[in-house]
């Protein structure tokens, strides 16, 4: 199965707004795909955040849902995909 790592920067003034939007994103993604994300912040840098989604079985459906649901965040996002070695 595939794990997705989506990272981006957030203006410090928008962190709480983005936090609420990310929770709504996680709820929608979980409803549609059964995959629950985790929101993380870079340890040594307060403006870099990451969404982690593990054990994605249906990549096509997940990517479609992620693209659709994340558009509302209005952030430039970078997505990386990893599989178990």
Question: Positions of the model-derived regions?
Answer:
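Short S/T/G/P-rich N-terminal loop/turn motif that feeds into the first structured element of a domain
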Residues: 1-67, 76-85
């Amino acid at each position: 199965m595939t794990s997705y790592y989506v990272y981006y920067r957030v203006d410090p003034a928008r962190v709480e707004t983005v936090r609420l939007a990310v929770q709504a994103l996680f709820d929608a993604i979980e409803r549609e795909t059964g995959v629950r994300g985790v929101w993380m912040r870079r340890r040594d840098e307060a403006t870099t955040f990451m969404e982690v989604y593990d054990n994605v079985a249906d990549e096509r459906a997940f990517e479609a849902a992620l693209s659709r649901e994340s558009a509302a965040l209005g952030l430039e996002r970078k997505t990386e995909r990893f599989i178990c070695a």
